[in-house]
Amino acid sequence: MEEIPIKVAVRIRPLLCKEVLHNHQVCVRDIPNTQQIIIGRDRVFTFDFVFGKNSTQDEVYNTCIKPLVLSLIEGYNATVFAYGQTGSGKTYTIGGGHVASVVEGQKGIIPRAIQEIFQSISENPSIDFKIKVSYIEVYKEDLRDLLELETSMKDLHIREDEKGNTVIVGAKECQVESVEDVMSLLQVGNAARHTGTTQMNEHSSRSHAIFTISVCQVEKNAEAAENGEWYSHRHIVSKFHFVDLAGSERVTKTGNTGERFKESIQINSGLLALGNVISALGDPRRKSSHIPYRDAKITRLLKDSLGGSAKTVMITCVSPSSSDFDESLNSLKYANRARNIRNKPALNISPQADRMDEMEFEIKLLREALQSHQASISQASQASSENVPDQNRIHSLEEQVAQLQEECLGYQDCIEQAFAFLVDLKDAVKLNQKQQHKLQEWFSRTQEVRKAVLTPLPGNQGIGNLEEGPQHLTVLQLKRELKKYQCALAADQVVFTQKDLELEELRTQVQLMMQESKGHAVSLKEAQKVNRLQNEKIIEQQLLVDQLSAELAKRSLSVPTSAKESCGDGPDARASEKRPHTAPFESHWGHYVYIPSRQDFKKVCSSTPVYSLDQVFAGFRTRSQMLMGHLEDQDEVLHCQFSDNSDDEDSEGQEKPRVRSRSHSWAKKPGSVCSLVELSDTQAESQRSYLGNGDLKMESLQESQEINLQKLRTSELILNKAKQKMRELTINIRMKEDLIKELIKTGNNAKSVSRQYSLKVTKLEHEAEQAKVELTETRKQLQELESKDLSDVALKVKLQKEFRKKMDAAKMRVQVLQKKQQDSKKLASLSIQNEKRASELEHNVDHLKYQKVQLQRRLREEGEKKKQLDAEIKRDQQKIKELQLKAGQGEGLNPKAEDQDGFNLNRRKSPFRSGDQFQKLDEQRKWLDEEVEKVLSQRQELEMLEEDLKKREAIVSKKEALLQEKSLLENKKLRSSQALSTDGLKISARLNLLDQELSEKSLQLESSPTEEKMKISEQVQALQRERDQLQRQRNSVDERLKHGRVLSPKEEHLLFQLEEGIEALEAAIEFKNESIQSRQNSLKASFQNLSQSEANVLEKLVCLNITEIRAILFKYFNKVINLRETERKQQLQNKEMKMKVLERDNVVHELESALEHLRLQCDRRLTLQQKEHEQKMQLLLQHFKDQDGDSIIETLKNYEDKIQQLEKDLYFYKKTSRDLKKRLKDPAQGAAQWQRTLTEHHDAGDGVLNPEETTVLSEELKWASRTENTKLNGSEREVDNSSSSLKTQPLTQQIPEDGPDSLPARSSIAPSSGQLQSIADKTEARPFTHSQSPVPHQFQPVRSIGPLQGVKPVKLCRRELRQISAMELSLRRCSLGAGGRSMTADSLEDPEEN
């Protein structure tokens, strides 16, 4: 198997609304066109996939998950899990939230993968797929089944199968058939999952969730299926795990207390174990060391995904906010380590697939044979139900035939031997003619017999044909039908190919036409755009020409009049002073030019005029850029929107004094000058009106864009909700229709049974009448007897008792008959009830279909509405682009406007000083507002700087704590290294001493006599051993000092974690220092500017020569600042409240959808239960119909008694099983007890078996081998310990010494513990012999070992089965037979006994 690394993807979520409102900085960003990511200033990480803040769900799925789905279909296991801190977008990415409240474009990985899987299934019709789904939650280190909430946590266990794969025992796996079924189960599990609200996340996942899709694939072989032959096909079972991990949490940030705090502890411990596993697998130096999978349950579940046999993708979700810098850095480090983990993917093909297929085919054939055999037996039993003696005779004849066949086989064997012997004898011995003739006749007769034996008898052949006839006819009939269907299919395929060709041709034509239409539409749009621009320019030019010509005509008419009237002393001038904007123009131009209405004026003035000012165009472009930025980011965050009312008020304030100045200036100059001034002012006024209309146009476009986008989101939510409800309604309608079919079927069965029981009702009525008549006659006789005076009192009393008994019996009979009659009437009324229920269900289905039609109509309406909104949004975007284009073109247009503007300025500077004064006042006002804004921004910067300083202090304190821990560990490491070095020096000194002693001893050995040489050599060997040991110690100490391994592995791991934490905190401190430095620099610059501006303010105020104004201005200035700051805070709170309201609305929508889903789910479960009830009713009705007149009450009572009896047996066998399991825990005691049993048996029987016992043992061995083969052919089998034990009792039952008549009557099937003990005591008191009872061999009494009474075979794996010896088998069967019943031979034994 090839090793491949797991794929790691990183996704950066956009800033949240709260983060944008509080001006959080972005500390994580991706590098475009690369797979790299930068955190802080210079920390770069490289991953397999990187997704920025603008990435979509579709992009993430197509890049990372789609290859995993294809691998799943190929037969590989796949896993995707999301990792990251809380609130980083893991659940959103995986798709584990509320499915119904999510629009189509925001669906996560799980819904998209489900659709892809079922699409792949539909594309492979030659493979039979079975899809199963499970949903498990790890909450507080406990497993919880989200699809079956009633399952106890103690029933869920993590185990490993035979292949080493991790499985969850006890989890519910639901088989699904469609996407709707899977989505419904996913929604049920998501609704049951633990979530909570913290300070960091409104919908924080409080548990780890694992959604598993199992795909079982079986290849089809149509040709082999046609011939009815066995065929081999591959079994592929693959799984896809979608893991949504809970996020790591900081208690200081989340603010969790109480239960949430306990959850945080469990979540962090599980994620710490996962991080340790990733570190151990990702570190190449620790690959051979232990991997701590068992530290947490989530790591045990992910064992196959991390370092196992699955294809894995890890999606790390990070937050770009600067407040989460350290968490994001740690997540990226873990993700970088995970890239070093290597898995070994393997195809999940079942190794026993061929064997299983062969067994399934054999089982199918055996079932068919069994059905045909049962049919023949049922026919024979119906035909011979009254001929029981004939059946016994048939059985006896069959036994005789079997014996005769055995004798015949023996005779054939003898004849064969004699034939061979006579052939040899004929060649070896000379015979006379007569003997040769007889021998030849015997040979010929033998040959004839052989031919007759080889040729089958016609009777046997007929029997074989009878047995194989129905199957053969069925196969032939099926083959004919199959050929007919194949011919029809071939004809249909020809037709379909023709239609496909026609369809392809039509599609190509449609595509060509669509392309042509698109080309025409593009050219049409371009032509319309050019035409519109030309029309607008023409209209503007025409309006300008009309205005100028009207003005010239007006001035030419007003020249002969007096100068006084023309300069503004008349009534028209006064009217123009009062209404300078529109009244003079309308009064003078009304007869010459067309004044458009408001709507027409809006259409005409929609574009920016050519003669706009540069500064106004600059402001216009700035607003356009702000609007486009807002439109790009409005799907992600809500931006702060500051009103421009002050600017509008300022512009209005500037316009009013200018108007006044113009109105006053009319009376100071002669007519010609007045005409020039009026003309220039008119152009300026029209210019301002056009500019005002442009701003209003932009604001209205912005507002309409926001409203349309909000409507679009609402429409998408409504569409998604309606689609979800339609899917649910479709499932409910289908289930209710199935229930109606079952009700109709039950009604038909009830009608047939009611017709059968109607006859019974009439019969019961007749019997009841007869019983009543007998009762009245008995009463009359009793009354007559009482009225008579009998002399014999005893006889009278006796007769009275007899009559009373008859009366009681008659009453009971009448009551029983009435009850039977009532039961029959109830059964007859069952069909009417079913009809009523069916009609109610049909009405309900009609109502659901009506709801479905309404939803479809609503879907169409919402779809049209969505299309309209999309078109409006596109139109608005096009208008915005046009306005920006015109604004950009207006910068360099028409220098005449600049000359005109310069002329106006020069004109205002020279003759009209009042206009300049008002303009200065407006400029001062603007300047004052700018100074206020500067101070506000400076205060805001100061607040942010204080927050950054506090955060830096917290990080520094945390770093100091980590440094203290690190210093302690380093000191300990230093002390340990010093101790090791001293130990090394001591060992080296001791080695030197030993070398000296060895050299001395070697000299002594050379010079010493032979007697002392032995002692000296022993001393030398001891010194050498000591030197070797010291050498090894010194080598180990040197190695530890060389590699620096002076601490324990746990302490080294802790030191490594501390170093990483300190590094992350240093990076965070560095980032904070940079941000603080930049803020301080900006504050210094702002302080300098502010001091200069304050000096300017003081100079200007001093120039006013009014001392009181200074104090007033300062008060006003502070008051304005405080008010603006309060306004800013209120706006911030308002927007936060709006976001909370929006989130609450989303929660309400999710809860409403969940409630609707649960209501439909409850209806679905109720329908399923009703369907199961109807199926049981059909079974009961069929049973009653087959019984042909038996009482319902009696049958139900028999069933209840049988159930009670079975419950008693089940309790007894469970208790026996528990006792045996307790005994099996002590293998030594069991071995000793078994040895004693064997000793007693050998002592009792002297170790010799008679021939009869040998025959019995051989038969039992055959029976045991068949039992073992049966067990080995199946995987595991449970023994039916209630009914099978009663039906298959062997003939070796224990009969007491008094004979079979003295057997005790049993009140229950299973003996009690007291009976077992008494039997055990009797068994120990009697010797084991075969001569105590005169009964035949099949009823020989055998003795039982008490502790083995009532043994229940334990469910074992095939690897634990073994073959039982003959002696052991005999003893076990004897022990089981002594209890009065037979049990399957138990093959359980301790491993130590093997």
Curated annotation (Swiss-Prot):
Record keyword Protein biosynthesis present: no
Gene3D superfamilies: Kinesin motor domain
Domain Kinesin motor: start-end pairs: 5-341
Compositionally biased residues, Polar residues: 1281-1295, 1309-1319
Gene Ontology biological process: cilium assembly; epithelial cilium movement involved in extracellular fluid movement; establishment of localization in cell; ventricular system development
Biased segments, Basic and acidic residues type: 571-580, 1267-1280
Any one Gene Ontology cellular component term annotated for this protein: cytoplasm
Coiled coil: 352-418, 498-554, 709-891, 921-1078, 1118-1152, 1186-1226
SMART domains (UniProt xref): KISc (SM00129)
Keywords: ATP-binding, Cell projection, Cilium, Cilium biogenesis/degradation, Coiled coil, Cytoplasm, Cytoskeleton, Microtubule, Motor protein, Nucleotide-binding, Phosphoprotein
GO molecular function (one): microtubule binding
Function, as annotated: Plays an essential role in motile ciliogenesis.
Protein family (similarity comment): Belongs to the TRAFAC class myosin-kinesin ATPase superfamily. Kinesin family. KIF27 subfamily.
Assembly description: Interacts with STK36.
The protein's name: Kinesin-like protein KIF27
